[in-house]
Amino acid sequence: MFRIRGQGPWEINLGCNFGCKHCYLGERPFSGLGWKDKVRLLDIMRAAGVLWLQITGGEPTMDPHFQGAYRYAWQAGMMLTISTNGSLLWRPDLLRLFRDCPPYRLVVSMYGASEESFDTLTQRRGAWKAFRRGMDAAREAGLPLRINVVVTEDNASEADEMAALADEWNVENHAYTNMTPTIYGGGEPLLAQSAAHLRQRKPFAGCNAGHTFFHADPHAKVSICKVGRDDQIDLMAEGIDGLTRLGTIADRLMLRTGGCEGCALSGTCRVCRPLAKHYQEARAPLHSYCQHGDKETAS
């Protein structure tokens, strides 16, 4: 039997109550598996050896089966991390769920330190108030929190304030500054970046995508990761045996092909091949992902 013995991020639903300008998902349809198929997917993940399950979205807590799926996975012995915008964490039913079945971590994205910047980036009036309400409730409940401080052009002037607010709450935080194209190769998220806050990536040193972890979308289409979604495996059709092809798919997708084939600088490339492909599809400036583009910025 195939056993991956690692992680299995799962997009339970792409639907979201925010409309963030920088979102890498692009289109966010509210759709996903029915309850029975969600249970079947979780059973397959457990049989495959998934120990750490990250449930994400969209906004995962909006899915009609989120609480049932979360509890089922928790009772199966998985360590659970939830990626959320925090806007619904005030709900009593969610607080009871996390009290009864403690998560390993709730990773909450912060999109500003003021109502104006937060609501502008999320393109939703009232988003800031919902975020603060959710965070106040989560902190009072003692939930294990981490904050991703998302820095964009809309909130760049508040980057230090966002980090300071997270520190004031005594919540571990990390600044996220470099956006990526959408999973469809759209360049819209790149337009939201704050040029002054972009960081130079370290050389890509390889990863175990498809070998020690995989990614499942809302319809149980499995890929090596959330970026490299080519050659997806339909777990509802193939079952656990379909996962045996993941390693071969991963090795093929990581090959330096297309415009990267034969590159003399591949040993110090800053992005993996699947991510480079998205940048190329988005017609992004070369310097945003490739060392060859450094000459453009230097001149």
Where does each model-flagged region fall?
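Iron-sulfur (Fe-S) cluster-binding segments and ferredoxin-like electron-carrier domains
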Residues: L25-L33, R229, I233, S266-A298
